[in-house]
């Protein structure tokens, strides 16, 4: 969170620039590849600011104009069509003479597919957007592999490729995750049907091994491979990035990058979760999914990083805090005071942010249910200080969109005799992303190689990590945040 620049001021400035770019496109009488590229180069890194504008919607003058311009330009290319795969198109281009005309064809094809993905995302056709963006990434990879630019120096298209590999890979993965969450037949219903064992007919002769095998449906799917491949492209692009941004734009870009990373880690935590059998009752055993602790820790970490890069009054600060609270609850076993701390932090930012309604409207069902449980626990406490030493129970998923199952009662940490196991590790391991961003800002290396000032096993670790990120990215804690921090970390309080 940048203390000098307000998010709304930043957004207004960007939209003013975007309005000029739109006007330029609308005034074109014929296709101009450079102006189309410049428009996309502005839109792609800041799409979260632009995508819901009316000018991007179906039937808008911009949509009509870009479709006409690109269609007319494509009609002049006779040796292929977009129904071909990216690899096949690259092979055809490679046979042509490596001249500016070939390069213009290459750019045109990429721009068409990018607009297809952009408009698919705007229309909430996430499958179309995912397929189009993935096509673009494959197209870029094949063109680089075949060295189509070897004989022609074109720094602009090289920089545009770099921008696409970083931002389109994250946007592509974002669309894939949304489509995955909304696909009840693929995810939600499967998990619910596997878990649902409350029929009395199943209370005898229940084969846990067979149930566990059937529940591990996610191992046989390729969702994890798709997500990790896109994740890898984005991290590799961030490692090699040479793009230059102003300080404010840089902070915005990093905040969005880490927020997308957190979203990816959350889904990996679910897809790589382990099956747990809960205590039997009159209806038979209950089965749930315990999320993967490593990926959930990464989710929390990247949301904290994202918050401290946010601009002042960015409504996404609240979104990230909601996700941190969700992650802490699903991590199973954290001390309640850690959740209390981030809950109070959320209240602090809500008081200072008049745009929090934007964040609340974006919450998914799982986040809403987690927040509801947390608020119920807090409301049930006559004196919250008395429960700060309590360890929260295991919380299992019985459906992708929520429907949580508490697997054990709250117990005091000192009385907890539970043995360590790979399902419920007591030691939090933080594997920071080794993104070397020295080409953008050398000092950012330190942000991504944080060594906790305390042992990771301590209950204050996440609170200390937040403080570290805040001080490193923003500056000294203001008085009110300093008092909040001391309340939850100083034993004398």
UniProtKB/Swiss-Prot annotation:
Keyword flag Metal-binding: no
Any single GO molecular-function term of the entry would be: structural molecule activity
Record-level GO cellular component terms = cytoplasm; meiotic spindle pole body
Q: Please, which domain of life does this record's source organism belong to?
A: Eukaryota
Q: Name one GO biological process term.
A: cell division
Q: Where in the cell is it found?
A: Cytoplasm, Cytoskeleton, Microtubule organizing center, Spindle pole body
Question: Keywords in UniProt for this one?
Answer: Cell cycle, Cell division, Cytoplasm, Cytoskeleton, Meiosis, Sporulation
What does this gene product do?
Answer: Involved in the pathway that organizes the shaping and sizing of the prospore membrane (PSM) during sporulation. May be required to stabilize the outer plaque of the spindle pole body (SPB).
Subunit field text: Interacts with CNM67, SPO21/MPC70 and NUD1.
- What is the name of this protein? Accumulates dyads protein 4
- Its gene is ADY4
């Amino acid at each position: 969170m940048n203390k000098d620049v307000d998010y709304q001021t930043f957004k207004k400035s960007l939209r003013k620039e975007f309005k000029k770019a739109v006007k330029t496109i609308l005034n074109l009488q014929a296709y101009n590849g450079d102006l189309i590229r410049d428009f996309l180069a502005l839109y792609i890194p800041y799409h979260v600011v632009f995508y819901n504008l009316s000018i991007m919607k179906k039937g808008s003058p911009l949509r009509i104009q870009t479709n006409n311009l690109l269609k007319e330009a494509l009609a002049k290319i006779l040796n292929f069509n977009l129904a071909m795969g990216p690899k096949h198109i690259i092979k055809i281009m490679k046979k042509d003479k490596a001249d500016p005309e070939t390069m213009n064809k290459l750019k045109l094809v990429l721009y068409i597919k990018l607009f297809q993905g952009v408009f698919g995302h705007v229309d909430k056709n996430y499958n179309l957007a995912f397929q189009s963006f993935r096509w673009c990434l494959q197209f870029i990879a094949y063109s680089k592999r075949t060295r189509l630019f070897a004989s022609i120096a074109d720094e602009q298209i090289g920089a545009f490729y770099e921008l696409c590999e970083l931002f389109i890979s994250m946007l592509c993965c974002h669309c894939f995750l949304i489509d995955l969450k909304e696909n009840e037949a693929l995810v939600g219903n499967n998990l619910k049907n596997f878990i649902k064992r409350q029929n009395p007919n199943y209370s005898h002769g229940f084969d846990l091994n067979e149930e566990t095998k059937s529940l591990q449906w996610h191992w046989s799917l390729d969702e994890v491979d798709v997500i990790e491949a896109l994740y890898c492209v984005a991290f590799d692009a961030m490692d090699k990035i040479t793009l230059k941004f102003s300080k404010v734009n840089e902070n915005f870009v990093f905040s969005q990058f880490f927020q997308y990373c957190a979203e990816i880690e959350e889904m990996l935590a679910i897809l790589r979760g382990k099956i747990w059998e809960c205590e039997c009752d009159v209806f038979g055993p209950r089965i749930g999914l315990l999320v993967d602790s490593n990926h959930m820790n990464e989710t929390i970490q990247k949301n904290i990083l994202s918050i401290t890069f946010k601009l002042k009054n960015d409504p996404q600060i609240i979104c990230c805090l909601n996700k941190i609270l969700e992650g802490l609850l699903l991590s199973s076993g954290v001390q309640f005071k850690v959740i209390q701390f981030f809950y109070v932090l959320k209240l602090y930012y809500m008081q200072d942010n008049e745009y929090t309604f934007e964040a609340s409207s974006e919450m998914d069902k799982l986040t809403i249910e987690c927040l509801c449980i947390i608020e119920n626990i807090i409301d049930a406490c006559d004196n919250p200080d008395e429960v700060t030493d309590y360890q929260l129970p295991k919380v299992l998923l019985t459906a992708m969109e929520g429907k949580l199952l508490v697997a054990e009662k709250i117990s005091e940490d000192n009385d907890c005799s539970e043995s360590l196991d790979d399902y419920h590790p007591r030691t939090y391991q933080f594997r920071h992303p080794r993104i070397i961003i020295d080409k953008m800002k050398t000092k950012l290396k330190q942000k991504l190689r944080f060594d906790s000032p305390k042992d990771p096993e301590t209950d204050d670790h996440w609170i200390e990590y937040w403080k570290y990120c805040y001080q490193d990215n923003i500056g000294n804690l203001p008085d009110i945040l300093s008092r909040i921090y001391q309340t939850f970390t100083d034993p004398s309080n």
